[in-house]
């Protein structure tokens, strides 16, 4: 760069810094190199599938899928993980369906959880913005986007047409929220439902409510749905297997999958999850129904193996460390096990 251009650029940078503050513009090579700050999901398998070790802070995350698929359970587990690390969490309950007893069983400290049950979509999103602007909240969950009803629709009559109101509301709110969340380092998790598009013959007929804005602004999108048969002990169903697909990821390669086991009444079992991941990584050997770690037999059946590890925390951490060393062997690309 010649001298005149260099001086002009330096003067422009000084003017910008004076007007907008230090750091408003900087050379990429001078920017501090930082690892992405994350909140663990409570599942090692999902943390590995995300590629960064959890849900990114300062970003928007969308968790969507069919009903009773484990979306709210996953979001509450993330809240529990944030609280366990001394963080503050908020739950915007637009569906008015939060069960405090279930949240407590998942490990959420309900006495410290900030909860709002807003009357309109505008009120819900303003609350999210104000909480994020405070800089004191680590994670905010909105349950759900489909329940963020614009005020005009609530005040109107049944049967009135309100085309595009919710999509415009979301678009306007997310434009403001993106910068606020980045500055406050707050993770915002939007839970969403799925709908069927009418008249779609080819391709995926599913779509999510709230327009396209959330798809664009979300750094991570997780598709959560049941997979296979329920988990049974004898003839009794005790839980469900859930497959989480990372549909979008701006921070690591997307299209990875994780299979979680959600048990009725207690949610994710992190030790059973570790056993699954350790088997996939070759750290724990499975022969028939027996699970072994090196020369040590852990037990017959996953429940017995998990129970043995709960009694030996030092062994649990040793296995976790070995799994993380072999994390590239654990992550399964979408469709890899389906013959695609």
Swiss-Prot record:
InterPro entries: AAA+_ATPase, DNA_recomb/repair_RecA, DNA_recomb/repair_RecA_CS, P-loop_NTPase, RecA-like_C, RecA-like_N, RecA_ATP-bd, RecA_C_sf
Listed GO MF terms: ATP binding; ATP hydrolysis activity; ATP-dependent DNA damage sensor activity; damaged DNA binding; single-stranded DNA binding
Gene Ontology CC, one term: cytosol
Localization annotation: Cytoplasm
Cell membrane among keywords: no
Binding site for ATP: 65-72
Keyword presence, rRNA processing: no
A Pfam family recorded for this sequence: RecA_C
Gene3D superfamilies (alphabetical): P-loop containing nucleotide triphosphate hydrolases
Keywords assigned: ATP-binding, Cytoplasm, DNA damage, DNA recombination, DNA repair, DNA-binding, Nucleotide-binding, SOS response
One GO term of the biological process aspect: DNA recombination
Functional note: Can catalyze the hydrolysis of ATP in the presence of single-stranded DNA, the ATP-dependent uptake of single-stranded DNA by duplex DNA, and the ATP-dependent hybridization of homologous single-stranded DNAs. It interacts with LexA causing its activation and leading to its autocatalytic cleavage.
Similarity-based family: Belongs to the RecA family.
Name of the protein this chain belongs to: Protein RecA
């Amino acid at each position: 760069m010649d001298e005149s251009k260099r001086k002009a650029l330096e003067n422009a940078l000084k003017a910008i810094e004076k007007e907008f503050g230090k750091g408003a513009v900087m050379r990429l090579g001078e920017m501090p190199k930082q690892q992405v700050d994350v909140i663990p999901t409570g599942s090692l398998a999902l943390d590995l599938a995300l590629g960064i070790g959890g849900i990114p802070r300062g970003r928007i995350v969308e968790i969507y899928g069919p009903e009773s698929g484990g979306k709210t359970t996953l979001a509450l587990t993330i809240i529990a993980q944030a609280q366990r690390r001394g963080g503050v969490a908020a739950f915007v309950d637009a569906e008015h369906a939060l069960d405090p007893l279930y949240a407590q069983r998942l490990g959420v400290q309900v006495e410290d959880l900030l909860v709002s049950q807003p009357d309109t979509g505008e009120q819900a999103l303003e609350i999210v913005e104000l909480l994020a602007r405070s800089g004191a909240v680590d994670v905010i969950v909105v349950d759900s986007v489909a329940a963020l009803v614009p005020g005009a629709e609530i005040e109107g009559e049944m049967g009135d047409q309100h085309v595009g109101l919710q999509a415009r509301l979301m678009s306007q709110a997310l434009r403001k929220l993106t910068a606020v969340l980045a500055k406050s380092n707050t993770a915002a998790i939007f839970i969403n439902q799925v709908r069927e598009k009418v008249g779609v013959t080819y391709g995926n007929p599913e779509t999510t409510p709230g327009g396209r804005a959330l798809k664009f602004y979300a750094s991570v999108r997780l598709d959560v749905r049941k997979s296979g048969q329920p988990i049974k002990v004898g003839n009794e169903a005790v839980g469900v297997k859930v497959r989480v697909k990372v549909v979008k990821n701006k921070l690591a390669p997307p299209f990875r999958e994780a299979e979680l086991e959600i048990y009725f009444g207690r949610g994710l079992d992190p030790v059973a999850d570790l056993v699954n991941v350790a088997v996939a990584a070759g750290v724990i050997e499975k022969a028939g129904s027996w699970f072994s770690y090196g020369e040590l037999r852990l037990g017959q059946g996953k429940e017995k193996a998990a129970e043995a590890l709960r009694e030996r925390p030092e062994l649990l951490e040793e296995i976790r460390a070995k799994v993380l060393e072999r994390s590239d062997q654990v992550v399964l690309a979408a469709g890899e096990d389906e013959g695609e």
